[in-house]
Design a protein with these regions (language model features):
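Active-site microenvironment for binding and transforming phosphate-containing groups
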Residues: 1-216
Length: 216
């Protein structure tokens, strides 16, 4: 069985507004402090491979701890832990019998098909998907143009905020899509905006990044 974990913002060294277990090197935090935070994660879970994420559909296969330009990683070796960094997007972890993957799924990732691309490259018959904490359908308010673009392709993404504004339920849409593909889904119900123990770009603007982690 694969190792899976989702970090929070607690237990690290970073000062506000990145306090404290910020794992993102690209958010303005002191790189030396982020390195200390990443070392803590290495000590707990093993050597970690990270991605420079850009909402692309790039999937890379890795066999050692590295840093790659991609939005999904696959490995077929147990010697590396895969990390996906988020602060509202969905950290999607995929567990197969002989491979695992970490996928960054935001609105653009949902539309560009990076999840299907990763599943196809894994080429596994039995896959379990773990969806970590992300922004929920009550909090992800969007404009009409964005709403219509996403809902045209994923009708189950349609949602509203508590005030009735248009919103998107990305984890709900992704869960339904995975289920249709025959993938078993395990979903963490926490919302990054609503849970103060998690980083949220939508809530805070300048902030850190937590991670979803998976290894064979």
């Amino acid at each position: 069985m694969a190792l899976t974990a989702f970090t929070s913002r607690e237990g690290g060294y970073s000062a506000p507004p990145y306090s404290s277990l910020n794992l993102g090197m690209h958010v303005g935090d002191d790189p030396s402090v982020v390195a200390r935070n990443r070392a803590l994660v290495d000590e707990m879970y093993g050597p970690v491979a990270y991605m420079n994420q850009s909402h692309s559909d790039v999937v890379v296969e890795v066999d050692h701890a590295t840093n790659v330009d991609a939005d999904a990683m696959i490995t077929r070796t147990p010697v590396v832990v895969l990390a996906v960094q988020i602060a509202d997007c969905i950290p999607l972890l995929l567990e197969g019998e002989s491979s695992v993957a970490a996928v960054h799924v935001g609105r653009r990732g949902l539309l560009n098909g990076i999840t299907d691309k990763t599943l196809n490259l894994m080429a596994e018959e039995n896959v379990v998907a773990y969806l970590g904490p992300s922004i929920c359908g009550r909090c992800y308010e969007v404009g009409a143009d964005v709403f219509e673009e996403v809902v045209a392709q994923f009708p189950l993404a349609a949602s509203t905020t508590e005030t009735g504004a248009l919103a998107l339920d990305l984890p709900g849409a992704l869960s339904a899509h995975l289920t249709l593909r025959g993938v078993a889904v395990v979903r963490d119900p926490r919302c990054t905006v609503e849970d103060a123990t998690l980083f949220s770009y939508r809530r805070d603007g300048v902030t850190g990044r937590q991670a979803g982690l998976i290894s064979l």
